[in-house]
Amino acid sequence: MGYCPNTPDEIREMLAVIGAGSIEELFAPIPAELRAKSFDLPPGMSEFELMRIMREKAAAGGAEIVPFIGGGIYDHIIPAAVDHLSSRAEFYTAYTPYQPECSQGTLQALFEYQSVICRLTGMEASNASLYDGGTAVAEAALMSLRITERNRVVLDASINPLHREIVTGYLHGLSAEAVEVAPDGCGSDLKRLIDSIDEETAAVIVQNPNFFGSVQDFSELAVKAHEKGALLIISGYPIALGLVASPGEMGADIAVGDGQSLGNPLSFGGPYFGFIATRKRFIRNLPGRIVGETIDNQGRRGYVLTLQAREQHIKRHKATSNICSNQSLCALRGLIFCASLGRKGFEELAVLNYDKAQYAKSRLTGVKGVSVMNAGTTFNEFTLSLPKDAAPVVEKLLACGVAAGVPLVQYYPGMDNALTVTVTEKRSKAEIDRLAALLEEALCS
């Protein structure tokens, strides 16, 4: 709510009601030595003056830096319709009510969101969102334990390292085993992943594109996992799904990912939303809210929160998830983003990301001593090998107003020279050319 200070007349009226002659008399019972003498605050400012100061502070904090950073969170366009529609009073809340008969508008929007996620992932059922990509991966791992009644999960080490930490933390609390399989260069080691699957394995978790930016086909891994009774979980980058084969097409049982890139701005950690989708036969093990479509006794279409017996307000400790308020406002933004672009626009956006990244790859590898570490296909993210440690180089470019990428040594010891660069549709040719020039200058100094 807005803050409207009391006028002098209102203050006098309130004091009269309680029988006090002044503010000083009101606080007289408090000993003088305990009262604040002065707050030493500057005089108030106009809205314009305050906005100018806040813009200056934002600029000092790096708001004007050109980002080539990805690693799970990406700088994408946001159509004006996303901000406009999601800020309507009917939607402007991040809370989803427990009541199955809550606002039909809210429920229909979330139902449409679920439909969009199913189309993107090639799956049959989706929930109404989770906190973020990391918790979505972890919830998928827990889901696989319930479905298979096993307690071992194989993790590809080329998935987002932060997501890996969340998964291992969740599994540790349940005394379940997490087995990490080292990558093969910048790609998943499919042979070692397959060899790691045994009769106690609940699921294999991979990411496509992975943290290094490599795109791979996991169809064979899905077949081998199913032969052993295990599930395949694929964590995906939603924008890439406009160009890359979906988890469903590859035979995955559960698809997850972070929805930040779908209409949600960069925001120092959130709030964002995570998506999770699965096959229809696993829907009762799907965590979180699920909105269903039905027909009432008058033949009218309606929407309800369905399959609620899975949830904590009914089953408590037996619930499939203890997440109660989901990220429905962020998920709504994701829906509006996808609807604004449409199928063709979404595909064009993915192609634009790919093309710009390919141009950047060619420009950056033109710098002496720089090479691409990815052996196969990449989307809008790729990993470079520099002739010197990447972290100091990134610091030099940051001083010039360019965030050059993610030095991998912080996540993968021994990869001191590796730098993962991300190029979205927002990066211009001039910005890419400047990155190449600054990189060359930094490597020569």
UniProtKB/Swiss-Prot annotation:
Keywords: Oxidoreductase. Its EC number is 1.4.4.2. It catalyses: N(6)-[(R)-lipoyl]-L-lysyl-[glycine-cleavage complex H protein] + glycine + H(+) = N(6)-[(R)-S(8)-aminomethyldihydrolipoyl]-L-lysyl-[glycine-cleavage complex H protein] + CO2. It comes from the Bacteria. CDD domains: GDC-P (cd00613). One of its GO terms (molecular function) is glycine dehydrogenase (decarboxylating) activity. GO terms for biological process: glycine decarboxylation via glycine cleavage system; nucleoside metabolic process. Pfam families: GDC-P (PF02347). The glycine cleavage system catalyzes the degradation of glycine. The P protein binds the alpha-amino group of glycine through its pyridoxal phosphate cofactor; CO(2) is released and the remaining methylamine moiety is then transferred to the lipoamide cofactor of the H protein. HAMAP family: GcvPA. The glycine cleavage system is composed of four proteins: P, T, L and H. In this organism, the P 'protein' is a heterodimer of two subunits. Belongs to the GcvP family. N-terminal subunit subfamily. This is Probable glycine dehydrogenase (decarboxylating) subunit 1. The gene is gcvPA.
